[in-house]
């Protein structure tokens, strides 16, 4: 955990992954780093090139982080596999073999918001995620199993594609009850082409997580610290 913090992880948790175990590796380590507040401030209405560039920078940082973590665990005699952004493929149903958000909820980092993004107490949804699997006997964190969004509808109203259904999540709930994932995808692509002038395979939008009440709390706290 110390190594991951040194590499920039701001949130770290351990998940019991017995039901998703691979080659005996039944512990998932979830890590998160926040999107800088100044980036989030500028994407409440539309994606920006600044955000697009930061998106790639943070993904690369996360890849390096979990690769270093897995290498360290292997050096200690355990099996470990880093699930980097560059190694994971997205299938036609927009799913991956290692669902970062599911691992993060099981590791206690946060819950799934109405936007179908992870929501954390400290940073809201303004986080990027990654993780690894290992058979090291790590003590699991307390999982989060219920939404804390309540009656909030900010992300639902902000979505330019009306892709967010507005359901409060509980662990195990099908994604289809929360988000029209393919509508979200097509909206992201269309907005990137319209606003940024290109689409090269990586999709961004950001409105839903930028307006999130928990994200807004993070922005206010960041502004307060900066002004002190």
Model-derived segments and spans:
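Non-catalytic, usually N-terminal nucleic-acid engagement modules in DNA/RNA processing proteins
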Residues: 1-64
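Catalytic cores of enzyme domains
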Residues: 20-23, 57-228
């Amino acid at each position: 955990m110390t190594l991951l913090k040194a590499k920039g992880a701001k949130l770290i948790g351990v998940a019991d992954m017995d039901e998703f175990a691979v080659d005996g590796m039944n512990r998932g380590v979830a890590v998160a780093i926040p999107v800088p507040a100044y980036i989030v401030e500028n994407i409440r209405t539309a994606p920006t090139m600044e955000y697009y560039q930061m998106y790639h920078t943070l993904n690369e940082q996360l890849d390096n982080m979990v690769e270093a973590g897995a290498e360290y665990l292997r050096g200690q005699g355990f099996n470990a596999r880093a699930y980097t952004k560059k190694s994971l493929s997205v299938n036609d149903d927009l799913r991956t073999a290692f669902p970062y958000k599911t691992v993060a909820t099981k590791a206690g980092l946060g819950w799934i918001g109405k936007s179908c993004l992870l929501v954390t107490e400290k940073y809201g949804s303004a986080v990027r995620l990654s993780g690894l699997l290992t058979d090291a006997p790590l003590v699991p964190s307390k999982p989060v199993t219920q939404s804390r969004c309540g009656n909030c509808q900010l992300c639902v109203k902000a979505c330019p594609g009306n892709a967010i259904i507005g359901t409060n999540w509980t662990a195990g709930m099908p994604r289809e009850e929360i988000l029209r994932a393919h509508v979200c995808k097509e909206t992201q692509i269309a907005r990137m082409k319209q606003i940024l002038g290109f689409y090269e395979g990586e999709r961004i939008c950001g409105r839903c997580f930028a307006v999130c009440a928990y994200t807004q709390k993070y922005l206010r706290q960041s502004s307060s610290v900066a002004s002190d």
